Amino acid sequence: VDKPKVVLGVSGGIAAYKACDLLRRLTESGHDVRVVPTASALHFVGAATWSALSGNPVSTEVWDDVHEVPHVRIGQHADLVVVAPATADTLAKAAHGLADDLLTNTLLTARCPVVFAPAMHTEMWEHPATRENVATLRRRGAVVIEPAVGRLTGVDTGKGRLPDPAEIFEVCRHVLARGVREPDLAGRHVVVSAGGTREPLDPVRFLGNRSSGKQGYALARTAAARGARVTLVAANTGLPDPAGVDVVPVGTAVQLREAVLKAAADADAVVMAAAVADFRPETYAAGKIKKKDDKDPDPIVLVRNPDILAEMSADRARPGQVVVGFAAETDDVLANGRAKLRRKGCDLLVVNEVGERKTFGSEENEALVLGADGSETPVPHGPKEALAETVWDLVVHRLS
C-alpha cells in the first residue's frame, strides 16, 4: 500500500525548529513526507536536517531538478500539504496567489487539503490584513489552525505561538482521513459546548456530573478538519485544547450560557454537547461546610438553572442558524428523546443511553440523531469522531 504523501512546508520563523517534531510524527506514523522550506526557513534549520529526518531529498528552489518540474509536480502528487510554521508573509502570499518560490508554487498546484499552522507576534496575527488573509484561505477550504497563547520571540507573550506539534499532527490526521472531500464547513463559524458544569456548594464541594467532554472535543476537531472556524466552550474537561480551535473555559451553567450566547452571535451552527446542570444551590457558603456531630446537616436548597438549549432554539442569533442538542437518557430513549426535542425546539437532538459502563469517559459512542422534521439517523457503536461526522453531515444539509 502506498504511503500517504505529505508536503511539509516550512516558512521562516523561530518556530521552524518545532517542525522537526511534526516531521518525526508524520514519518513515524507511516507518511511519505517531502519538506519544502523557504529560503528564510533555512536560516533556522538547514536542508541536511530536513533530509535526514524525512528520508527524502529536500527541494528549496524552483530551479532544482528542472527536468522534473518540481514547482508543479510536488503539489500535484501530494495527499496533504501542511505549512508549519506559516508566517504572516506566507499566509499573505497564499491568500493572494503569489508564486515567487517553491512553497508558494506548491500551494497553487496542490489539489489536496491544505493546513496552515500560523506562528507570529500577536500584533501581526491581529492585524486586519492578516485577519482578512486568514478569512480568505478558510473560505477557499484551507484549514487555518488558531495559534496558541504563550511565550513568543524575545520577552513578548500573547497569541501567536505555534501550536504544539502533537496537536498539528492530530489535525493533519483528521484532514487526511477525510481525504479530498469538500471542506463543507469552510467559511462557517460553529460553536460547540463540551464537558460538564459544576455548581459550587462551598470552596471545596460542588454539584456536578460525569461528562468527560470527549464527544464535544471530537465535534470540535472534526468541524475544524471540515474547514470551520470553531469556538469550543469547555466546562471542566481536563482535556488538551484541540489545535485549530478557539477554546473558552467555563465552570458553571451561568458562565457557560454567557460564553455560548456571546460566541453564537455570528455562528452558523451551535452544538450543545455539554452536560449542563439543571439546578444549582441557592446559596454559596464562603467557607467549607463543617460536619456537626450532634446535628443533621442543613438541607441544600436548589434553584433552577437557565435552559440554554431552549433559549438558543427560541431566540436564534441569526436567520438560518442550526441548533443541535444532546440528551443522555437511562431508559425509553426514543420516547424521551422525541419529547425533549419538541420541548427544546432545536433542529437536531443527539440521544444516547447512559449508565454504568456506558458512554461516560469512553472513546466510543452510539446514538440516535432525531430531527425536528421527523427524521431518525441511527449511529452504530464506534469512535466518537464517527458520531461527530454524522452530526456535521446533518448540520451541513440543513445549512445548505
Predicted feature locations:
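A cross-family phosphate/adenosyl-ligand binding-site feature
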Residues: V1-S400
